[in-house]
UniProtKB/Swiss-Prot annotation:
Needed cofactors: heme b
Protein name stated in the entry: Cytochrome b
Protein's organism: Natalus jamaicensis
GO CC term (a single one): mitochondrial inner membrane
Binding site for heme b b562: 83, 182
Taxonomic classification: Eukaryota, Metazoa, Chordata, Craniata, Vertebrata
Binding residue positions for a ubiquinone: 201
Amino acid sequence: MTNIRKSHPLTKIINSSFIDLPTPSSISSWWNFGSLLGICLAVQILTGLFLAMHYTADTSTAFNSVTHICRDVNYGWILRYMHANGASMFFICLYLHVGRGLYYGSYTYTETWNVGIMLLFAVMATAFMGYVLPWGQMSFWGATVITNLLSAIPYIGTNLVEWIWGGFSVDKATLTRFFAFHFILPFIISAMVMVHLLFLHETGSNNPTGIPSNMDMIPFHPYHTIKDILGLLLMLTALLVLVMFSPDLLGDPDNYIPANPLNTPPHIKPEWYFLFAYAILRSIPNKLGGVLALVLSILILAIIPLLHTSKQRSMMFRPISQCLFWLLVADMLTLTWIGGQPVEHPYIIIGQLASIMYFSIILIFMPLASLAENHLLKW
């Protein structure tokens, strides 16, 4: 009699995806972030579901309903802060996951990579709409500023913005629809994750060397499940420390002021995980140009497989590309810092230089460095 794990239609899907999955023996802890992202998504859906039971998507009561959750609902405060800081953890894991893909050449699995980019856009949209829901000052003005960017689209821009708002400004209709989208998108993301894994399991995992490892595979369970559990414990520890000791560390104090359309905050800025893109947006004086740069700052990931000029897949043995990669990381951190600063000298010029560097490294320097490294191989 065959093992039910391998014969039952449901369990054999789980078995081939998480138990008997052949996995390269050499993959490092950088490969933990996929499973951590899955855990983050599960935590966000669970905490979000319980928050939605007590939240009201109405401009007159939204702010008070969040206060009610924190004060009156049993363990409501932990739900709220797990959800808010869970989003930060989600993005930390996302950026590390994408960075791993860039460094080790995982983008050569183009289907997996492209589904991943769509997932990144979906998660960013979900997080943006979630930030609007508490209806604080930064929620309202963030929603106003970011949705208003669509008015830069020629001809249809103004109509498009008013259609999204459901009126002539961000108001009750906007909040209601943002709540609806914020609720449904994580389930769409879950379906996209399955497609992401489907494409990944067609090719198998990459490994740090970038060399095919078909002759050196081990089962996912128990070897990598144990490794993933360690990563999970470390992430949950970090999240719980953040939630218990300084839950507002990554938030904006302005969001504790109820939304007031008549009073603009001195510095409108999104959550920290969007600041790098916001800095790129602000560094271009033209509105349409800024919006294009904002979209391209993420969409540029889609053309990275086309820019791969190296004979080697991974950067493991490519020191020039490694230097450029870490320069790109430093540049993104600089952009994140600039995005949170006021629009004044010297921040404007630093932001513009960092934005030029961001696109130059990806589009020009990295492909050229790869070609140079190809020549060095011949020596």
